[in-house]
Amino acid sequence: FPDATDPVIVQAPGRVNLIGEHTDYNDGFVLPMAINAHILLAGSVRNDSEVHIYSIDFQAKSTFNLKNFIFSQEAPWSNYIRGVCAMFLEFTELKGMNIVLQGDIPQGAGLSSSAALEVGTALLIRNLHGLNTDKIDLIKLAQRAENEFVGVQCGIMDQFISMLGKAGHALFLDCRSLDYQLVPAPFTEAKIMVVNSGVKRGLVDSEYNLRREQCQAAVEALKPLLPEITALRDVCLEHLPLIEQLPGEDRKSTRLNSSHQI
């Protein structure tokens, strides 16, 4: 974009999760940490309502108009940016933008490249438009973009650690209250190794949403016996026999996945 002026540059990291797989959307506790791989975005405002995006990694462009845009089948990578724009437009006006992005977070490796793109886009839009939206609200906005626009019913952990991660620290997060604490993790006598299994995964076309539905189905099935519960976080080890007794062969996966959470 040779005519771009006053560019803004932001970055957002990927993450690994030390404790708490699939517990964030069950209102549980998680302990992720940011990694030294990021998505970098550079942007500038335009004089119209169009958003022009260029991905260096994909060597691909995507363009849409803020006044009328939809989910893109042709450029699915752009939907994370489109979704964040859609969330901002619920409470403020946006100018058109030129956006260039590049990253070194391996895609489809479970390191939350999508959350990093959402968080980076949210920071970029805030800074380009001089908004005062705080980081917690940006985290919630980024999660909603993935839930409501992209269509993945993710929890809030990935966006949280991408926004608030700090070098040398893990982040202990209560996914119900959103209370969090940065925990020093110097690892002087140990190292965290991130190993690529070679198995590609993508939340949009995976069974991620099904796992969430099964966990919620277990909660609904248990409510007649445990009326006080609202999520699997409220179910204790002593309640495991109740999970195992849920009737129906079609609920076998529900029993297994919900038991794993507890």
Task: Mark where each language-model region is.
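C-terminal nucleotide
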Residues: 2-15, 40-74, 169-258
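ATP-binding N-lobe of GHMP and related small-molecule kinases
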Residues: 1-115, 119-135, 140-144, 149, ...
